[in-house]
């Protein structure tokens, strides 16, 4: 133990003495091709008490350094040499030995000095060299050793903190540490590797900068065909299970990456989300109309009416009030009727409740309202379709009773239950509705004229109100509706198929009586198939309606006028109405409403009968074939004409509401009145109130 301690003390003493004598004995290698300069340099170094080794060739100096790596502490080399450039020697020494190198040259330009420093020279001396400069070159050796020691200590600390692996030969607490030279060499190797990597990285960056277009990814344009392939792949996988990788495999398109498919899939899902929001909005609209199945929103064009536009899924309902439709709130079957004063020029009317409930479902009404508006293309509906200058005719026809009669009959029918032969015969049929107009015999100047209305089913267009083409309008499954209404009060059935009958009593009250009775007469159906069915009726107008002859261009009808024998004579007329597109489950097989009461005027009674056949079928292109006969008696008291009349909302006594739903405006979108252009039809009908062009 004592001997070991003594040896350690001796070594420390020697090291201390060497440190005290430093830089005496520092080993220096001098390289210069000029022998004179080399001899002067060697002499000056020896005066500084350095150990000097000199050579005039750079290759020889490099060989000495490689053979004896630990024999030299410093290298002094000339810049310009014949066998090897001084900068090249500087690079090799710095990479292999990690020794400090001092450059020596007569060229003191800044560019040359900068080149030497950048290549790793620790100092740059100019010839002729001076001894004062050589005395302080030892600081480069000390600086390099301390720098290497600091790096070694840093590497040692990292290795000590690193956990030992299981396959190492050293113990778990024995870090592997080599000598300072080995650490220096390893650090130099790491520097060399990092330097090479940096050079390669710089070269790559330079190449990338030279070719910027190669770095950018080509943009994919999603054409129609490419999008179809994408949608087909998504549908095959399912929207929930569709992932970009599987979609790309199914599409099998070159130059299409997963990122492109992922981006397009995200946009496609957002598109489907927006479509779902629109569909939910439409479903809420259908629910507001009371419909259960919104499939009618996607049905094609209306069969039989080529100009009819269906309800578009993306269209909104800007002007149609869903609360305006008649909804059934009670089981009462009676009609609410209101009495109207004859002297007043404005006729207050109410709306019947049964016909809309049986004839047209609420969702179909909403579909019809929007579809007809879109078909005509009118941005705004005119509220008074017959309200023109000198609007006296509006008082005669009781406001909008005729217009609402048509508006309630338009239906949307999904499919037909008749055989193709029956449908073909019905399409070729021509149906006419020529009600006749007559002045009561109590007046001196009477006008007897016949009003004719016709529809040509072959043209698949509406040529007159109240007449529509029929496809499969006749069915063996008819539901008779038998109803009778008294004339105690006046009413206007906005959505009914019946024609009103008006009387003015002795007290000046304007009343309407109506009777609906079953009719089993099939002559109408047969005539409709052959195209020769028509019926006539009588409407009594006051004298002042003669000035509206330009509106009512009357002619001879196929049926003769039925004249009244007197005020005491009872006149009963019947009418056949074909009423289709009505499920049998919504109507009882036999509904009877009896409230008959004969009203007498000057010891005379008046009754009005209307027969209606309800055809239970699931599909027909058109829905209504009204064939009506009217017989109305009006006393000599004339109804005063007024330019405006009230078509506001009314509440029915039977518990039915019509809050703001104006079917006059709906009819306005179909028919546009033209005063001066009233075409006639030969022999089949009396006249057409409106030209065919206004209805298309």
Curated annotation (Swiss-Prot):
4-aspartylphosphate (modified residue): where?
78
Main subcellular location of this protein, as a coarse class: nucleus
**Key word Protease present in the record?**
no
Q: Which residues bind DNA?
A: 214-273
Question: Which residue ranges are recorded for the region named Disordered?
Answer: 154-214
**CDD domains per the UniProt record, alphabetical:** REC_typeB_ARR-like
Residue spans with biased composition (Polar residues)?
Answer: 176-185
- Using the record's annotation, list all stretches that form the Response regulatory domain: 27-142
Q: Which GO terms describe its biological process?
A: cytokinin-activated signaling pathway; phosphorelay signal transduction system; positive regulation of DNA-templated transcription
Q: What keywords sit in the KW lines?
A: Activator, Cytokinin signaling pathway, DNA-binding, Nucleus, Phosphoprotein, Transcription, Transcription regulation, Two-component regulatory system
Tell where it localizes: Nucleus
Query: Which GO MF terms does the UniProt record name?
Result: DNA-binding transcription factor activity; sequence-specific DNA binding
Q: Reply yes or no: does the keyword Calcium apply.
A: no
Family annotation (InterPro entries): ARR-like, CheY-like_superfamily, Homeodomain-like_sf, Myb_dom, Myb_dom_plants, Response_reg_B-typ_pln, SANT/Myb, Sig_transdc_resp-reg_receiver
Gene Ontology annotations for the cellular component aspect, listed alphabetically: nucleus
Composition bias, Acidic residues: 195-211
PTM comment: the record says: Two-component system major event consists of a His-to-Asp phosphorelay between a sensor histidine kinase (HK) and a response regulator (RR). In plants, the His-to-Asp phosphorelay involves an additional intermediate named Histidine-containing phosphotransfer protein (HPt). This multistep phosphorelay consists of a His-Asp-His-Asp sequential transfer of a phosphate group between first a His and an Asp of the HK protein, followed by the transfer to a conserved His of the HPt protein and finally the transfer to an Asp in the receiver domain of the RR protein.
The entry assigns this protein to a family as follows: Belongs to the ARR family. Type-B subfamily.
Task: Give a short account of what the protein does.
Answer: Transcriptional activator that binds specific DNA sequence. Functions as a response regulator involved in His-to-Asp phosphorelay signal transduction system. Phosphorylation of the Asp residue in the receiver domain activates the ability of the protein to promote the transcription of target genes. May directly activate some type-A response regulators in response to cytokinins.
Entry protein name: Two-component response regulator ORR22
Q: What is the originating organism of this protein? A: Oryza sativa subsp. indica
Please state the gene responsible for encoding this protein: RR22
């Amino acid at each position: 133990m004592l001997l070991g301690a003594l040896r350690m003390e001796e070594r420390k003493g020697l090291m201390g003495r060497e440190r005290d004598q430093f830089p005496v004995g520092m080993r220096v290698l001098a390289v210069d091709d000029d022998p004179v300069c080399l001899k002067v340099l060697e002499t000056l170094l020896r005066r500084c008490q350095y150990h000097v080794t000199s050579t005039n060739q750079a290759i020889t100096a490099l060989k000495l350094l490689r053979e004896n790596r630990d024999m030299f502490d410093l290298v002094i080399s000339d810049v310009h040499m014949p066998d090897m450039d001084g900068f090249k020697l500087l690079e090799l020494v710095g990479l292999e030995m990690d020794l400090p190198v001092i450059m020596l040259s007569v060229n003191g330009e800044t560019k040359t000095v900068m080149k030497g420093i950048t290549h790793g020279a620790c100092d740059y001396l100019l010839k002729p060299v001076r001894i004062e400069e050589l005395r302080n070159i030892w600081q480069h050796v000390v600086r390099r050793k301390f720098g290497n020691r600091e790096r070694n200590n840093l590497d040692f600390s990292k290795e000590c903190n690193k956990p030992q692996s299981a396959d190492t030969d050293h113990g778990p607490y024995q870090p592997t540490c080599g000598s300072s030279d080995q650490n220096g060499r390893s650090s130099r190797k790491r520097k060399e590797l990092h330097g090479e990597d940096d050079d390669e990285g710089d070269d790559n960056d330079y190449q990338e900068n030279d070719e910027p277009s190669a770095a950018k990814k080509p943009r994919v344009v999603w054409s129609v065909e490419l999008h179809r392939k994408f949608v087909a792949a998504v549908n095959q996988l399912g929207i929930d299970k569709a992932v970009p990788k599987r979609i790309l495999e199914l599409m099998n398109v070159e130059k299409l990456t997963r990122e492109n498919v992922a981006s397009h899939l995200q946009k496609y899902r957002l598109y489907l989300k927006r479509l779902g929001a629109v569909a939910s909005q439409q479903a809420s609209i259908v629910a507001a109309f009371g419909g259960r199945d919104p499939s009618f929103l996607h049905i094609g064009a209306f069969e039989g009416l080529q100009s009819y536009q269906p309800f578009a899924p993306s269209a909104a309902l800007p002007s149609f009030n869903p609360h305006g439709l008649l909804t059934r709130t009670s089981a009462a079957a009676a009609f609410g009727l209101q009495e109207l004063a004859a002297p007043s020029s404005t006729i207050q009317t109410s709306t019947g409740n049964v016909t809309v409930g049986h004839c047209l479902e609420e969702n179909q009404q909403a579909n019809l309202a929007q579809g007809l508006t879109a078909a005509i293309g009118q941005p705004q509906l005119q509220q008074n379709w017959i309200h023109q200058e000198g609007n006296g005719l509006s008082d005669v026809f009781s406001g909008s009773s005729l217009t609402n009669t048509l508006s309630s009959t338009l239906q949307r029918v999904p499919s037909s239950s008749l055989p193709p032969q029956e449908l073909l015969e019905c399409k070729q049929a021509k149906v006419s509705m020529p009600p006749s107009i007559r002045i009561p015999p109590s007046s001196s100047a009477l006008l007897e004229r016949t009003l004719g209305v016709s529809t040509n089913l072959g043209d698949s267009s509406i040529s007159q109100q109240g007449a529509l083409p029929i496809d499969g309008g006749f069915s063996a499954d008819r539901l008779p509706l038998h109803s009778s209404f008294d004339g105690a009060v006046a009413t206007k059935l906005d959505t009914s198929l019946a024609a009103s009958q008006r009387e003015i009593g002795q007290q000046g009250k304007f009343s309407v009586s109506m009777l609906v009775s079953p009719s089993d007469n099939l002559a109408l159906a047969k005539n409709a198939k052959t195209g020769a069915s028509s019926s006539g009726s009588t409407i009594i107008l006051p004298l002042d309606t003669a000035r509206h002859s330009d509106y009512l261009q009357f002619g001879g009808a196929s049926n003769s006028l039925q004249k009244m024998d007197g005020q005491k004579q009872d006149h009963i007329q019947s009418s056949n109405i074909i009423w289709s597109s009505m499920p049998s489950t919504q109507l009882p097989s036999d509904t009877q409403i009896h409230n008959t009461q004969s009203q007498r005027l000057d010891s005379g009674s008046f009754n009005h009968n209307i027969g209606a056949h309800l055809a239970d079928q699931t599909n027909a292109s058109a829905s209504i074939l009204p064939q009506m006969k009217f017989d109305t008696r009006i006393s000599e008291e004339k109804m005063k004409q007024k330019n405006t009349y009230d078509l506001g909302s009314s509440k029915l006594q039977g518990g039915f509401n019509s809050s703001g739903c104006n079917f006059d405006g709906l009819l306005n979108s179909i028919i546009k009145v033209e005063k001066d252009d009233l075409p006639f039809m030969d022999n089949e009908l009396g006249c057409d109130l409106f030209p065919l062009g206004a209805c298309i």
